[in-house]
């Protein structure tokens, strides 16, 4: 699902709210979440999951074209951990 599809779906489910308001709301939610991660804050949405930053150590990588070794700097990357309810919903029963 893309951001546009989410906005369209929410607008259809809530016909009393204009599509523009839904679009602005979704954009603001994502902006606030991005800002929180930028400030190294953890985001927890009960029943859905949590977002946090994971630190990646500096390491030696390899250029796939040339095979040459390349030094990669340390960095923080966003990480999502699914919550219990989300895991249960997507787990298909065999």
UniProtKB/Swiss-Prot annotation:
Q: Some GO term, biological process aspect, for this entry: which one?
A: regulation of DNA-templated transcription
Q: Which PROSITE patterns match?
A: HISTONE_LIKE (PS00045)
DNA-binding found in the keyword field: yes
Keywords in UniProt for this one? Answer: DNA recombination, DNA-binding, Transcription, Transcription regulation, Translation regulation
Per the similarity annotation, which family is this?
Answer: Belongs to the bacterial histone-like protein family.
> What binding partners and quaternary form does the record give?
Heterodimer of an alpha and a beta chain.
Q: Enumerate the PANTHER family for this protein.
A: DNA-BINDING PROTEIN HU, INTEGRATION HOST FACTOR SUBUNIT BETA
Q: What is this protein called?
A: Integration host factor subunit beta
| Organism field | Actinobacillus succinogenes (strain ATCC 55618 / DSM 22257 / CCUG 43843 / 130Z)
